[in-house]
Amino acid sequence: MENTEKLKNSKEVIAYIAECFPNCFTLEGEAKPLKIGIFQDLADRLNDDPKVSKTQLRAALRQYTSSWRYLHGVKPGATRVDLDGNPCGELEEQHVEHAQAALAESKARVEARRKEQVKKVREEAKANKPKAKKPQQARRPQNAPKVEKKPVETRALAASELNVGNQVNVNMGKGNMAATIVEVNKEDVRVQLANGLQMVVKAEHLRA
């Protein structure tokens, strides 16, 4: 039993009619100009063929005659052919001009699409290009928390410790400063600081 499954698209239909009418339709090389009204001839010849419908034939014929192969074949001096390859008259000048204009327009559209595609690819590549990372600046060391110096624990100086040469601390209000007793005059005591400066202070301001 023959396979009667319908053809799926215009490409398959063109291949099928090229097989049925090899002297008229070709799949390779320059195509021959077709007889005017050849669609009706096709529809009549394939009327009982379950593989293809008139709608499919019309779409396939439109695709075939708008291909670059076919438009290249429509040139001065070329002859139209019928389904069996028989000549059906020479092409008219207006038909040649129309075919050449259609070919130029089709090529221009393809070129425009190609340029648009190239532009799109470049833009996508540019967008996907990883951005150069800025050199990381050396992190500044965070200020270490200031360690509060605990004041040196001192005690009140005993009267027996008020002797020349003894090391003492002078209470200066903001803190104690090391000093050496150089002279004792009752409650007044002369001391010498570590920087060599001498001063008289009250005994009550001295601590051990």
Swiss-Prot record:
GO terms for biological process: post-transcriptional regulation of gene expression. It comes from the Bacteria. GO terms for cellular component: cytosol. Keywords: Chaperone, Cytoplasm, RNA-binding. SMART domains: ProQ (SM00945). It is found in: Cytoplasm. Residues 107-127 have a biased composition (Basic and acidic residues). The keyword Chloroplast does not apply. Residues 107-152 are annotated as: Disordered. InterPro entries: ProQ, ProQ/FinO, ProQ/FinO_sf, ProQ_C. One of its GO terms (molecular function) is RNA strand annealing activity. Residues 128-137 have a biased composition (Basic residues). Transmembrane segments: none annotated. RNA chaperone with significant RNA binding, RNA strand exchange and RNA duplexing activities. Belongs to the ProQ family. HAMAP family: ProQ. This is RNA chaperone ProQ.
